[in-house]
């Protein structure tokens, strides 16, 4: 039996088939994505593997369908039901801004217009006590009116429901009994945190995605059933865990950024296999460049993420769910180079995407992209694109890049390298955002480069950041899909709990955590996870008294009855605050605002097969004809290597190009690449 993972990207759809033991992938496929119907690309990628679906026990899927729907605004009509007096929470938002000094700042546009934000009677106070009964007649009347006006989905977010969810649950039950045609989402099924604006934004996004994700997943399940797939379809969540297709249809907001998460799972697993604790994941695909961190062998998460769209402005829409901490910028192989009104050259964030794609694809694209520039520079070989399965035309690439060279009256090669010289520092800056701006020195980390376009730029980025160790993973173009096969089951639980740290009762805290874990244990048992594979991770959100934001602290395994436990929490918060913000106030009073439990159902660990060992010098059959490559302002004669024929212990000295079916690695002068026992390339300065 085998395990299958399929990852939909903005440009390509990747599939990996792995044996049951979790060793090296058996089969890989990479084909262009199909934006008109993403499920078609999934099926095509499976068919390309030429493996019978009835031999596959599990199918894990990472998708960008929900993310793309939000960005593009392709929603079905939805409405918001909220407590009387809170109709404009979505419009008021928060007073803080990403950039306080932007004179052209614009607030996010509400995701639901005011005429579809409806108030209903009923009230619960902040202690969870009902002060006014839910007005059922008012609810029915207003829902009926909304449906008559074409509303297909309802989001319900009532004030203080995090403290008592009975009104939301009652409203949902009444609507489903009386109006079965409309889909309903309530905020407390997603999160029980305070922060009214963020909770409202989250449930609204969930409601907007209900129809889209239901239609997509039902269609996909029908197609894979036709291929005789006997198992369950599982999806990657934004928190890095697995969820069933049934749950994804109910809470689709958890699939946002699902397609990006596989990469960090792969980086974490690779680190564990190689014995590395601290890594930077650098994923460059066709549309974006994504940065993630693994610190102490675990990936970083954030209690809330934001998604930016044309209507959200620079702040983005908040989504109040735990998520892998990913920083993405619009720099990928398909990113378009363009000149602004001041004659400055930019790269991205606009992308040629899968259709029409870079000019070299010959599918109607005419604008110069990063891929076109690399073809012009000789860093990519046209005949080797996707192993020769996809035809690209270097002349089309030259014609596109010539727009830039003609504008600046410069040589074609200089213009092409100019595009790369803008793209690479932009990606380095994205890594600085995740490291330097948080008090972390990237030079202390190992950078793991993957994605189809990643290895081509990895050495350039590392040189910019003075990172001396870079790993180019095996199967870089399918690395994220492989990472999905390493995912565990995971659900996150959050409970608002506001308490001064000095007054904290450890027995009460233990009781609250135990209650959450009891609920989580029952859920995992129902999903067939054995007790021996269950793991619970406790965290608390803490802030200085009077602050409006909190930091999340992982709790140690020390018994809560330990007398030094509160002091340890206090000290660790001060240390994290100093690292993150460059200041702290150890003598300032602190308060806990939320308790968190990550319930994890561990799956079978993955491993990698080793490759044959050779001498320091690569064998002759690993050599391909040399060619001139434009690097650092001049043409250089570069040795070209076939990565599939390299052996462990081989060493390659730059400048050189290492080619494989789905990616190409550029090695600069004064750098050396060593092949390890698994086939990874370790790039270091000579």
Predicted regions and their residues:
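Conserved short loop/turn motifs at secondary-structure junctions
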Residues: 54, 155-164, 206-209, 416-422, ...
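Metal-dependent DNA phosphodiester-chemistry modules and their immediately adjacent helices/loops
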Residues: 188-224, 482-511, 515-516
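N-terminal glycine/serine-rich phosphate-binding loop of ATP-dependent small-molecule kinases
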Residues: 1-78, 125, 132-155, 168-187, ...
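Terminal amphipathic helices with adjacent charged low-complexity linkers/tails
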Residues: 157-203, 207, 384, 555-559, ...
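C-terminal, non-catalytic interaction/recognition modules in large multi-subunit enzymes and RNPs
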Residues: 8, 137, 141, 145, ...
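Conserved phosphate-binding loops in N-terminal lobes of ATP-dependent enzymes
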Residues: 5-8, 12-16, 27-28, 32, ...
């Amino acid at each position: 039996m085998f395990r299958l993972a399929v990852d939909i990207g903005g440009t390509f759809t990747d599939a990996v088939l792995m044996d049951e033991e979790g060793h090296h992938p058996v089969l890989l496929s990479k084909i262009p994505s199909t934006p008109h119907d993403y499920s078609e690309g999934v099926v095509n990628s499976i068919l390309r593997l030429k493996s019978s679906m009835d031999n596959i026990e599990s199918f894990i899927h990472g998708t960008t369908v929900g993310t793309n729907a939000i960005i593009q605004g392709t929603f079905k009509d939805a409405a918001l039901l909220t407590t009387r007096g809170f109709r404009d929470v979505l419009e008021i938002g928060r007073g803080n801004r990403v950039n306080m000094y932007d004179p052209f700042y614009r607030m996010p546009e509400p995701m639901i217009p005011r005429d579809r934000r409806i108030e209903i009677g009923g009230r619960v106070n902040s202690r969870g006590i009902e002060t006014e009964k839910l007005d059922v007649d008012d609810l029915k009347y207003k829902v009926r009116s909304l449906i008559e006006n074409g509303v297909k989905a309802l989001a319900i977010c009532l004030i203080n429901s995090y403290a008592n969810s009975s009104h939301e649950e009652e409203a949902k039950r009444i609507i489903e009994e009386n109006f079965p045609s409309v889909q309903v989402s309530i905020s407390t099924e997603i999160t029980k945190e305070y922060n009214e604006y963020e909770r409202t934004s989250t449930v609204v996004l969930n409601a907007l995605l209900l129809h889209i994700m239901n239609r997509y997943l039902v269609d996909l399940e029908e197609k894979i059933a036709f291929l005789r797939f006997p198992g369950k379809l599982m999806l990657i969540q934004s928190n890095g865990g697995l969820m069933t297709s049934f749950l994804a249809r109910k809470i689709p907001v958890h699939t946002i950024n699902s397609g990006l998460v596989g990469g960090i799972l792969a980086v974490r697993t690779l680190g564990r296999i190689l014995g590395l604790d601290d890594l930077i994941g650098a994923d460059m695909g066709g549309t974006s460049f994504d940065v993630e961190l693994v610190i102490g062998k675990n990936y970083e998460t954030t209690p809330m993420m934001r998604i930016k769209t044309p209507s959200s402005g620079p702040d983005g829409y908040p989504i109040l769910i735990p998520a892998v901490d990913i920083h993405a910028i619009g720099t990928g192989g398909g990113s378009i180079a363009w000149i602004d009104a001041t004659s400055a050259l930019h790269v991205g964030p606009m992308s040629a995407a899968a259709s029409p794609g870079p000019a070299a694809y010959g599918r109607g694209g005419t604008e110069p992209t990063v891929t076109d520039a690399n073809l012009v520079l000789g860093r990519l070989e046209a005949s080797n694109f996707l192993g020769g399965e996809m035809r690209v035309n270097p002349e089309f690439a030259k014609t596109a890049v010539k727009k830039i060279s003609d504008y600046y009256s410069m040589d074609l090669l200089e213009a092409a390298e100019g595009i790369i010289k803008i793209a690479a520092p932009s990606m380095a800056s994205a890594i600085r955002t995740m490291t330097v701006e948080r008090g972390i020195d990237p030079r202390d980390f190992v950078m793991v480069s993957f994605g189809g376009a990643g290895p081509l730029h990895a050495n350039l980025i590392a040189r910019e950041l003075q990172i001396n160790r870079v790993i180019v993973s095996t199967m870089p173009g399918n690395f994220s899909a492989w990472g999905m096969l390493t995912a565990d089951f995971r659900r996150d639980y959050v409970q608002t709990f506001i308490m001064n740290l000095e007054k904290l009762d450890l027995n009460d805290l233990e009781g609250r955590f135990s209650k959450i874990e009891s609920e989580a244990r029952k859920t995992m048992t129902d999903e067939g996870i054995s007790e021996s594979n269950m793991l619970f991770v406790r965290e608390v959100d803490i802030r200085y008294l009077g602050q409006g934001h909190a930091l999340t602290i992982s709790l140690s395994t020390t018994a809560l009855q330990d007398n030094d436990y509160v002091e340890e929490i206090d000290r660790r918060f001060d240390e994290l605050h100093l690292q993150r913000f460059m200041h702290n106030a150890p003598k300032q009073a602190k308060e806990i605002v939320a308790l968190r439990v990550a319930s994890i159902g561990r799956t079978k660990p993955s491993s990698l097969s080793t490759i044959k060992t050779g001498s320091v010098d690569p064998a002759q059959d690993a050599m391909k004809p040399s060619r001139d490559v434009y690097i650092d302002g001049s043409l250089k004669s570069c040795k070209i290597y076939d990565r599939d024929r390299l052996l462990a212990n081989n060493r390659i000295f730059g400048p050189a190009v290492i080619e494989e079916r789905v990616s190409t690695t550029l090695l600069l002068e004064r750098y050396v690449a060593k092949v390890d026992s698994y086939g990874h390339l370790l790039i270091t300065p000579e």
